[in-house]
Amino acid sequence: MRLIAAIVACALSLAAPVVSQDRLPDPVATFSILGYDPQTGEVGGAVQSRVFAVGNGVLWAEADVGIVTTQAIVDVSYGPKGLALLRAGMTPQAIVRALLDSDPDPGYRGQPWPKGGRQFAVMDAKGNYAVHTGPEATAWAGHKTGKFCTAQGNILAGEAVVNDMVAAFEATDGHLSLRLMAALDAGQKAGGDKRGMQSAAMLIVKKNGGVWLNNDTVLRLQVDEASASDPLKELRRLVEYWNTRQRPPR
């Protein structure tokens, strides 16, 4: 029991947040989907937002461990901390509680950056998941869970965004990348982020599932800036290009 407590304490001490005194960061208003394919063993996620380079801090994944998405009033350290706790054998539900309990609720230049606004989801390598939307996440904010998937978002047009994402993921056949992409498209069709579109990303992992030797990254795609057009259109082009030219590992 002491060993487990020590592992948890060590994991939660990783990547402690560094509070910038220069500016108040913008909330990562976004919608995202995490999903698992029991046939391939792949786990992955995809995200779209009206911020630059959303893929840089929202999605965190490790083969044979799981995936974490952290957004809204975001603490990026939830990503590596969540993976460390998964690696230590904790359940997604326990990890959600541990991350919130250990959050110091910091402020920026005297302004609150409340953990009540955090939104994050944790999925293990077998598709088990837990998700949290804090009461201070900017409306509309919430999540919807489904079979081997969870969709979450904030500053959205409404609840239909996450509902339609889950429905699209469950109804779509083919590789996990196509199912994640279908979910993003459905979320945008339902209204998406109320502020518009700018960037999108996708990350899928599996042990030795990538090209070349000792590569666990099946797919890592980022469209960092497309505010004048449609980041999902470009992300879909890349996903479809990969699917026509690669034979995804099984």
How does the language model describe each region?
Residues 5-15:
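Bacterial N-terminal signal peptides
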Residues 16-20:
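Sec/Tat signal peptide C-region and signal peptidase I cleavage site
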Residues 21-250:
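N-terminal nucleophile
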Residues 2-7, 65:
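Sec-dependent signal peptide recognition
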